[in-house]
Swiss-Prot record:
InterPro entries hit by this protein: Beta-tubulin_BS, Beta_tubulin, Tub_FtsZ_C, Tubulin, Tubulin/FtsZ-like_C, Tubulin/FtsZ_2-layer-sand-dom, Tubulin/FtsZ_GTPase_sf, Tubulin_C
Binding site for GTP: Q11, E69, S138, G142, T143, G144, N204, N226
UniProt-annotated binding residues for Mg(2+): E69
Keyword field contains Magnesium: yes
Protein name: Tubulin beta-6 chain
Gene3D superfamilies on file: Helix hairpin bin, Tubulin/FtsZ, C-terminal domain, Tubulin/FtsZ, GTPase domain
UniProt function note: Tubulin is the major constituent of microtubules, a cylinder consisting of laterally associated linear protofilaments composed of alpha- and beta-tubulin heterodimers. Microtubules grow by the addition of GTP-tubulin dimers to the microtubule end, where a stabilizing cap forms. Below the cap, tubulin dimers are in GDP-bound state, owing to GTPase activity of alpha-tubulin.
Gene expressing this chain: TUBB6
Entry's Gene Ontology cellular component terms: cytoplasm; extracellular exosome; intercellular bridge; microtubule; microtubule cytoskeleton; mitotic spindle; nucleus
Protein family (similarity comment): Belongs to the tubulin family.
Protein species of origin: Homo sapiens
Motif (MREI motif): 1-4
Cofactors: Mg(2+)
Length: 446
């Protein structure tokens, strides 16, 4: 079977990751002790994508949990699904990274990284045919961003032909934990551009907006935000975990979604987003799902897709529904909003349908868009970065760990290049290239 090894790094990564395991354990009928209590053969058919089956019929997540301080790990271990994970797969330091990317990437994190790689290697040896890795982390802190990107590059060295997929929580302007977030995020993006195959950009600000506006929560907690993220992660990985009509694995997804290797930053979305109490008052239809899912307010990244154009889109519909209706709706959306899809990639919307809906819903859909509007997110971080870097504010924390200012300059220019690449493809039209060819031909004739 095509296995995936899951890694969660840092506080945010561990909280989102653990929530993800709770959700998919529930979907596959795995109880907190790892026993199977489900009622459908479909739940077990592809269970070994994410779980190892132990000799005593216990299903164990194929996961490595990493942090530079013990706190988060303790709360995972004492949480509802704490007994699910293999005890040896908790790897933590004692010092913490103090929201410092350099500590996570060069000093503290580098000391712990070999222990993590040992666990990852062990998990990979249990695999029949490993398809790739997924990492959950945030880019604003120290461990998830610094050590997370270090792990990615080390794993890349050792498994160069496997897919590397990350769920990265981007720092947002309104919800800020630390002053140096723009530094940490820029240094991380610099790594992600080079070393990952697909990155789902999740943004706290967008999640807060969804909680306020759509779910009508007056005081959203991190628990509510993580609930949204886990619903999205569960949706994105559906076609890997359940037999569906379009069985995507990570590589097929990458082939469909990434037209240029550097432009692999996706905007996820989820529908239906209804507040907890109001679900019973409405029946969902495929047209409603499709409508909601392309709505800017349902995006988990704080970018407006109407400000850019979609290079590619993948959608996953879950629940009993007719394929024909789904295809008709998707075509309708594309023809109505054709200006928002680049015309030089025909058939750039892919649809997968899975018969098993998420817990508590009759039908649901997940959206993955590769849109040029994601540049707004990078622009925002880049502006904050430049404002501080111009004054060299807080830089001594990083140089003190052995970093060079040159690295900051490189990361900054790499991010700006990324923004202009997105802009270039946003402006490109189908006949741009032809004009260039005509010019060349004239020169040859001359």
């Amino acid at each position: 079977m095509r296995e995936i090894v899951h890694i969660q790094a840092g506080q945010c990564g561990n909280q989102i990751g653990t929530k993800f395991w709770e959700v998919i354990s529930d979907e596959h009928g795995i109880d907190p002790a790892g026993g199977y209590v489900g009622d459908s053969a479909l739940q077990l058919e592809r269970i070994n994508v994410y779980y190892n089956e132990s000799s005593s019929q216990k299903y164990v997540p194929r996961a490595a949990l990493v942090d530079l301080e013990p706190g988060t790990m303790d709360s995972v271990r004492s949480g509802p699904f704490g007994q699910l994970f293999r005890p040896d797969n908790f790897i933590f330091g004692q010092t913490g990274a103090g929201n410092n990317w350099a500590k996570g990437h060069y000093t503290e994190g580098a000391e712990l990284v070999d222990a993590v790689l040992d666990v990852v290697r062990k998990e990979c040896e249990h695999c029949d045919c490993l398809q790739g890795f997924q990492l959950t982390h945030s880019l604003g802190g120290g461990t998830g961003s610094g050590m997370g990107t270090l792990l990615i590059s080390k794993i890349r060295e050792e498994f160069p032909d496997r897919i590397m997929n990350t769920f990265s929580v981007m720092p947002s302007p309104k919800v800020s934990d630390t002053v140096v977030e723009p530094y940490n995020a820029t240094l991380s993006v610099h790594q992600l551009v080079e070393n990952t195959d697909e990155t789902y950009c999740i943004d706290n600000e967008a999640l807060y907006d969804i909680c306020f506006r759509t779910l009508k929560l007056t005081t959203p907690t991190y628990g509510d935000l993580n609930h949204l993220v886990s619903a999205t992660m569960s949706g994105v990985t559906t076609s890997l975990r359940f037999p569906g009509q379009l069985n995507a694995d990570l590589r097929k997804l990458a082939v469909n979604m990434v037209p240029f290797p550097r432009l692999h930053f996706f905007m996820p979305g989820f529908a239906p987003l209804t507040s907890r109490g109001s679900q019973q008052y409405r029946a969902l239809t495929v047209p409603e799902l499709t409508q909601q899912m392309f709505d800017a307010r349902n995006m988990m990244a704080a970018c407006d897709p109407r400000h850019g154009r979609y290079l590619t889109v993948a959608t996953v519909f879950r629940g009993p529904m007719s394929m024909k209706e789904v295809d008709e709706q998707m075509l309708a959306i594309q023809s109505k909003n054709s200006s928002y899809f680049v015309e030089w990639i025909p058939n750039n919307v892919k649809v997968a349908v899975c018969d098993i809906p998420p817990r508590g819903l009759k039908m649901a859909s997940t959206f993955i868009g590769n849109s040029t509007a994601i540049q707004e997110l990078f622009k925002r971080i880049s502006e904050q970065f430049s404002a501080m870097f111009r004054r060299k504010a807080f830089l001594h924390w990083f140089t003190g760990e052995g970093m060079d200012e040159m690295e900051f300059t490189e990361a900054e220019s790499n991010m700006n290049d990324l923004v202009s690449e997105y802009q270039q493809y946003q402006d490109a039209t189908a006949n741009d290239g032809e004009e260039a060819f005509e010019d060349e031909e004239e020169e040859i004739d001359g």
